[in-house]
Amino acid sequence: MLTDSVCAYCGVGCDIAAEVENNTILKVSARPDGEVSEGKLCVKGKYGFDFASSANRLGKVKIKKSFLDKHSLFLPSKIRTMLASYRVDNQGYIHPSLEEAYLLIAWKIQQVRMQYGNFAFASIGGARGNCESSYVFQKFTREVLRSPHIDNCARVCHAPTLKGMRSIIGEGAATNPFRDIHKAEFMIVIGSNTTEGHPIVANKIISAVKKGAGLALFDVRTIPLAKSAKYNAIIPFETNLMVLNMMAHTIISEELYDSTFVQKRARGFDAYKREIMNDPYADPEFFQKVKGYTYLTEMIKQISREYAAKRSLILWGLGITEHLDGSYAAAAICNLAVLTGNIGKEGAGLMPLRGQNNVQGTCDMGCLPYYNPDYEKPLVEGKKTPDIINAIGEGEIKVLFNMGEDIAHIHPNQTKIHRALEKLEMLVVNELFDNEITGFADVVFGVKSGYEKTGIYINAERRMHLSQPLIENDLPDDWEVIQGIAKALGEDMGYRSSRDIWDEVQVAAPKRFSGASYDKLTQKRVSGLQWPVFEEETPILHIDSFRTKDGLAALRYKPWFLRGMVRELLHEKRKHFYLTTGRVIAHYNNAAQTKESPKLLKRHSEDVVLISKEDASYVEGKERVVLKSRYGKSEPLKYKLTDQVRQGTLFVSFHHAKSKINFLFGDEADELTKTARFKSVKVCIE
């Protein structure tokens, strides 16, 4: 018997069918008629299920004995007596009941609130949990803790996409379903190694190319999709915004834009045109001055012409967002779609390739400091994750709740984060496994995984899937832990099931979910529904108007500024290597789940640095290398000489915490959202 659910990994959100025996997953496959998977899964989807039955899974709850000792003089006698009866394990933890842990946490919350006030609390969530837990998490933070400081892992991925897209077209989500890739005549992939980051989307792209569609790539290195591309534009580090502006410059100067569409559906064109035509960095001819990249002048023009003339899609990933100008680059992509009318119709639109399986849904639920559910503005805007870290370091925030986001591994400036976490008066973590963040935690709750619970996940195309358990365990779901803490504080949230929560979400976020009931989603278990859902779903956005106040797109120009690699190339002064980071197909983010699968761990057991063959002299005689930046250094790493990266540039994955890759990054971030600049850092090789 096969049980249908949804994959627990990336933002593609593939439908899966699992064979289960004796409460153990034996095999995972895709339905041949699957709307998203189209009958295919990547290696993570196929083989990355061993974590669910791993002996390394966390138990229900554990509390550090040192935390209790620190508070022994102040604990109420009832709590002290209850917890004193538990044996301390070899790692220094006790394992009480859930209710006893809730009471301890509630006592500490009340103590901190009396001394420091409500803004001494903060919450940071991941996006691997379901929408129901994300909704309860933000509600708990805002209404029970009475703090505005709520954020999620979008801070280190697609927060700039949300910001940039909303500034132009009023909505920060994909405009079209993935199936429209098959209907496109031309596609641009920029800042996305789709084959490894979103493999099933890459399958669709390759299929479309085989049927005659054109493909253009913009990246700082050669990626597997290059084999299928008509144009493979290798660009200097930190030039996304520049090349996107150059495309717009070409489209306007050669009068390739859709004047009728622009006149009817947009505002601000005249000012936009004036600014772009007077910006020397927007003219593709600028690349004639950049040694090693002169070919880009003509290639950018050719790509622009095809994009404007054909039914076209633009797909992008973290190679766009994780930069100083990530939000502006996302906005520039939207400008191109509006200029050419490549939006609001089949086979033409915008596809940000969201990272985690529910990062779209987590944002939709309001786990952001500047948005409530349905992207409504809160009365008080909270702190973003980097600001939360700073506030912890400065003693302003005393208690942190963390729901599935390993900030002690995945986020930048790890030296600062580790120091900050040590200053907290209490850190409460919900997780599946011990990882870097649990080592700092005072209380750790083991919770259900995505394969053990009911809940809604929203993928990168706005598609909602209602998952169902593949196997059973007695661990709580995230929302049950949160509700338990609230109840111990005297705040009964009143949820009996995930359905109860979703019924409330439909009322709290009616612009997207009013018609998306559990019953309707159960009927559409395999295919799902794309929000907004009223009587019917909405596969394509912006058909008649944009989701702005006046229904018009707002063309806005942001110039690129000279810096980094381009500045060095202009002056022919190479001083550093430029490092970019990313995923490999076998693992997902901190590898907490994938490393539990022997087949996946065998494929990628450690992070490896890719170095250009032209830079072989820098590693001659070395078995391993250490990367060093102004912020920190990595552990000794394996390396591989390759043609996939250009001279003076490096690539490395970040999946294994022992590599200390994220110790290389500092606080440089997107100007508007503070998303870390993970895609460019100067390093030297030791």
Which residues fall in each region the model found?
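N-terminal leader/propeptide and maturation segments of large enzyme subunits in energy/redox metabolism
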Residues: 81-94, 256-295, 470-539, 603, ...
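Phosphate/diphosphate-binding loops
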Residues: 2-15, 416-417, 423-426, 430-435, ...
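Extended redox/cofactor-interaction regions of prokaryotic respiratory oxidoreductases
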Residues: 135-206, 211-218, 242-245, 334-443, ...
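Active-site phosphate/pyrophosphate-binding segments
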Residues: 247, 264-384, 534
